[in-house]
Amino acid sequence: MSLRRLFIKLLLVVSVLGFSTSLFANEQDDLKAHFLEELDDIIKIIEDKKLTKDERNSKIVAELTPMFDFKLMAKLSLGKKAWMKLSKDEQERFVALYVERMKNSYSSKIDSYENEEIKITDIKRKKNRISLETEIATAEKNLKVVYKFYKPKKRKKDKDTWLIYDVEIIGISILKADKAQFKEFLRTKTIEALMEALAEQKTT
């Protein structure tokens, strides 16, 4: 089972989760309420039999987008050295391609939604970052999944107050996995070739 397939499953069923902490209670309660509200909406979309597959996927992606800082994820996945070599226009192009890749990945995994049992195991906060540790029970074994949120100093347009910038599944960071993949690609090829490869994924 792929990391991204597990990830979208977790996003879709996490509405059963609850947050519990005595520190920063008000802010984390707000995060809980909004996060669960968004995910409840996603469940309703999935269960709406009147929607076509494309309509359903489009609506779900629209619900997920405000929860993630895809631009930051794109920048971090490419790495500072490679990012700084890009012009502003190239940076914008890379971000657009990365975002499209992520959205397509999530959309393609929606049909695999199942009602696995998930429970909160821990919540850790350090300044403007929150790590929400969960455990998902599958037929094979229990898997540890960590959602990583951060709070931007300034609220981003059309985005939530707290944003997901990475997810770790059984100790493997989606962000770091992308970074390693891109780094290996760039050992022998150019940034332009990488963007062309990402563009080709849009059509496949």
Predicted regions and their residues:
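Surface-exposed, charged secondary-structure patches
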Residues: 104-146, 204
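Early exported N-terminus immediately downstream of N-terminal targeting peptides
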Residues: 28-109
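Bacterial N-terminal signal peptides
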Residues: 9-20
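Low-complexity, intrinsically disordered terminal/linker segments enriched in charged
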Residues: 166-204
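Twin-arginine (Tat) signal peptide motif
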Residues: 1-10
